[in-house]
């Protein structure tokens, strides 16, 4: 006899999907999104940008290679849940230290498998991201809808995932001192900077400009992170004060915050960009780069007109803004993840562009 379903998803518009539990069995109300990556589920569950989200993996088989300690993107994953079609609880990988389900239990990440992820993804594409309840099979449909109606997703995601104190990452052959504002920073960003001779001081999201200046940076990095960029006005204020004084490089949420600091606007996409194969055109070189992306919001193209920003990159799937710069202020940013993890490395050169700006600053000092 087939195993009985023991978990379910109830979406706020009434859709319902049945499945089986893996990972933690806690009930949660989250925002449902999907990711099209084939591999990289460990980096996905440990990416702070997925805070308060339930991620549907479109690739049908997840868990094959287990979990490797050194591949985490943050020490304490904050993703809400993982939704998959088929889960493999017997990984084959000499580097694996435990199964995906064991890791998810350890960090309280809910999981459900056996779900028709093709239909669910199609629903998200057609109707957009929305609230979902992950719960036990005993929860009735009407009970689930009532819970969804009365539960709001918190807006404190950046403060939740940002570190509370400064942390220093030394480079073996230090050439530059970078201060990174942590809005939910992935570890591979730190690795990418350190590998290029940057000693990195990671500071909390709400660190003011004066304290950052006291660290004598050669350049400032604004990290990725979760949620609505308009929910972190403190960081926008800090960027505004630092503009023109130091070279600044921003990624993902950092890109949105930089744009807002110049007076541009942001808006929420219908279902966001999440995956490792998004084509982007570099307008300066006319080359196409395949990029890794994970974001719900985008910078409004029309709102950039009249600011000091210039659009540098465009998404070829929906023509949204993927990069901006202000040459006179030595500041630039991209909506995607050049550090990959997971994903292609077509855009890793952007870290080298940041290095060039810092080198120019040192030469002109």
Question: Model features per residue range: what roles?
Answer:
Residues 218-290, 296-301, 343-361:
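Cysteine-nucleophile active-site neighborhood
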Residues 110, 177, 247-249, 265, ...:
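Proline-centered loop/turn at the N-terminus of a beta-strand
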Residues 175-179, 199, 247, 290, ...:
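Residues that mark the start of a beta-strand
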Residues 323-365:
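A glycine-centered loop/beta-turn motif at secondary-structure junctions
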Residues 116, 252, 295, 337:
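Active-site glycine-centered loops adjacent to acidic/histidine catalytic or metal-binding residues
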Residues 287-329, 365:
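Catalytic beta-strand/loop cores that center a nucleophilic Ser/Cys/Thr
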Residues 172-178, 285-288, 326-331:
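Beta-strand-turn-beta hairpins that frame and shape the catalytic cleft
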